Amino acid sequence: MLKQFFFICIFFALVSHAQVAGTSIFSFLNTSTNARQTALGGKTLNLLDDVDQPTWNPATINSNLNKQISANYSSFLAGISIGSVSYAHNFSGIFKTFHSNITYVNYGEFIQADVDGNETGTFNASDIALALGTSYQIPNSHIYIGTSVKFIYSSIANFSSTGLALDFGAIYYNALKPYTFSLVMRNIGTQLSTFNGESENLPFEVAIGASYLPENLPLRWYLTVDNLQQWDISVPNPSNQTTDLDGNTTEEEISFIDNALRHFIIGAELFPKRAVNVRIGYNFRRGKELQLQNVRTFGGISFGFGLRMNKIKLNYAYSRFHSASNVSTFGLSIDLNKNRTEIAPTKY
């Protein structure tokens, strides 16, 4: 069964192309809005019991998510508000379960000025994405594949842009095994309309993920390796520049190992199946890019907790970006299935 999964991985890799988020339009699509996801580092791909997870890996859509709804909100950096709502529902047919999601970003109000700097009023900017997805189990295997389609709308003052994107995911899951493996290709698509007539790339991304739950230890580990479509994702940190006595500035030199580590995100969840659990994660790239010279900022670290009360689950995440900025994310999940006595366990 694992061989089938690896063949799928190779196929996805062959059709991928280079694109790193941050150099493209609609970059908000690669920002986590889920409190549980955020606490684990921001890009976990293997959460099988979370109705928000299909936003990152549509292969995790499964029947146990039926009639679960979740809402998340974060007062992000610089007064930016981000949030999302997810819902899953079972139907009859080959594609039994469908998942829907709305993600939005409100950048707030800005001062509008003419070319001479004279203020002429204010304007707003926002992004929104609507997604619908489903999954399918490959017969006689433990491999599940999924896809979702996203309609994207972005506006800045009187200008706007729309786009259409697809996510593809695959996951190897066996209820008798303590591990899972995932492969995801996200944001494959194009702009339907542009801001100024110039077409821009979407934030295409390829990532693999894994999770492992030791037999006698209630601590599930998560690993994500992102941006596989491009090896060099390093950006010199201005804080690490050096200046000699003549005033010549030398940028930070990023080693092979340093760049490799920036692809990694790790997370851990203590008591993952209990009513109360604790989470922690570390994003190596964020930690390196927001590092301050000779100052311990703890950038890249995130942590949080989950609290389940009957059919309601509260999630909280605290993300450390910089010594001058931190982000709190709140999540609320409700199980609307009257025939289920508890939140679905971690299985299909």
Describe these PLM feature segments.
Residues 19-348:
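Subset of outer-membrane beta-barrel
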